[in-house]
């Protein structure tokens, strides 16, 4: 038997700094210098023996904040694709971001040409001329965009909007009240005239607001619902409407609005080089400030699967930066990138800032 003083207590090893992991620089914290912008560099992923990367050829520079109101304005920005019929003042980001997808061979680091390896053929019963085959299938290429702060450290896709200034956006983001419950035939608290056995019931006006009771074979009165003039029920009997509130400090709504995804198009740049392009012509920001766009490219048609059967979608990111001015200040316009279709036999044509443009399906 040892005394308490005679017991041997092992001395814990000294705490080594090697056991403490260094802070990650992928997303800098408050103590990390913002000059470490490694997380803002474009990401190139390797898949199926190819290198995929994004090149923002036309950077978004500035725009006017569109706010939370429902003001009607004009679409004077660069429009590439047909927009839905709407009267909302989008005030899109200018110039619209134009992103080029660069696909390289992982072994030779040579850019893969997407020109057709066979001549174009005419589809029967159609007036469109399309490519019969190509080295790259762009049918399932999708580009998505998110709004981040100027340092690229946190998302700002949502913004809190004050409930004192209603708009269509806040009305759409509110929840609907629950459906009214079925009305019971009897209403407790209201006088329902019942008569004993042997006395005929009192017959009043059809719209008089008084119930009619009949006797069944068991001696219990059977009541029927009342009918009120105008088809309306008393306020105390109607189901209470649930008020829609935006919380103590307002409600959250989207800060980046518009078309947040784009499909791929085969276009020719001013150097007469065919490439895979993504055009984001309908992007608007509600609030004022300096932001970045996080652009991610995915191939939704990939057949690679993980062990649990979920499809693998590799993101390819780019971080263009732009600033938003107040709604009354008009930013100067800049000359857009001139893009055209690789074939003149296209049936669909649009205009990009007074410049002819054709689109191929």
Curated annotation (Swiss-Prot):
Where does the record place Low complexity bias? Answer: 323-336
Cellular component, GO, one term: cytoplasm
Signal peptide (UniProt feature, chain positions): none
Q: Which residues form the Velvet domain?
A: 47-353
**Annotated Pfam families:** Velvet
Chief subcellular location equals: nucleus
This chain's function reads: Component of the velvet transcription factor complex that controls sexual/asexual developmental ratio in response to light, promoting sexual development in the darkness while stimulating asexual sporulation under illumination. The velvet complex acts as a global regulator for secondary metabolite gene expression. Component of the velB-VosA heterodimeric complex that plays a dual role in activating genes associated with spore maturation and repressing certain development-associated genes.
Protein family according to the UniProt entry: Belongs to the velvet family. VelB subfamily.
Q: What is this protein called?
A: Velvet complex subunit B
Q: Which organism is it from?
A: Penicillium rubens (strain ATCC 28089 / DSM 1075 / NRRL 1951 / Wisconsin 54-1255)
